[in-house]
């Protein structure tokens, strides 16, 4: 049965308006975005098929167009709608960590980095540049590709830090494998960068490694002492 033929108040859109978006299941939220189903398959069923096929929202939102459009009832238009929702979520996260904001909440930093890096299919090495009061100056993606001790150049990091007049730095990168546990190469890179930054009196506050569902902090493990 089409959702428009359901009793008043039972459809996902009505439920959202009456009870709030937080009360909807993942499939119901997808149904609101998808809007229309196909013959014999309403939007809620399509949402459930998407979740079942991809295993969850994160995998769905990071899947390529050709893979998403393999699901019955999903074409380029619906794929575009899903991607727009995912991008809005990312942009909200960016606004939550604005220039001039003081980093007093580690959870805010973790959430920001998770949103920026967890869904990448390739490695990204980035810097979160801070001033002397630990206020955000800028988030910069510095290197992409296979990140190892040979591909991260301390002189480029130092040059950028000097250019932006940062007083402290949080370095971060993701593991496309989804496993956040740092490698020995990660530890070597961190030591090299810590020593390079020390020559210009800039503090390395942390190195955060981003996986699919967690972030490992070098500072919390005592690896920066």
From Swiss-Prot:
UniProt keyword Lipid metabolism, yes or no: no
GO function term, MF aspect, one: metallopeptidase activity
Protein name: UPF0758 protein Sden_0326
Gene3D superfamilies the UniProt entry points to: 5' to 3' exonuclease, C-terminal subdomain, Cytidine Deaminase, domain 2
Family: Belongs to the UPF0758 family.
PANTHER family: DNA REPAIR PROTEIN RADC, UPF0758 PROTEIN YEES-RELATED
Residue interval(s) of motif JAMM motif: 173-186
Keyword Transport tagged: no
Sorted UniProt keywords: Hydrolase, Metal-binding, Metalloprotease, Protease, Zinc
BP term (GO), one: proteolysis
One Pfam family per UniProt: RadC
InterPro entries on file: MPN (IPR037518), RadC_JAB (IPR025657), RuvA_2-like (IPR010994), UPF0758 (IPR001405), UPF0758_CS (IPR020891), UPF0758_N (IPR046778)
Chain sites annotated for binding Zn(2+): 173, 175, 186
SUPFAM superfamilies tied to this protein: JAB1/MPN domain, RuvA domain 2-like
Domain MPN: start-end pairs: 102-224
Domain of life: Bacteria
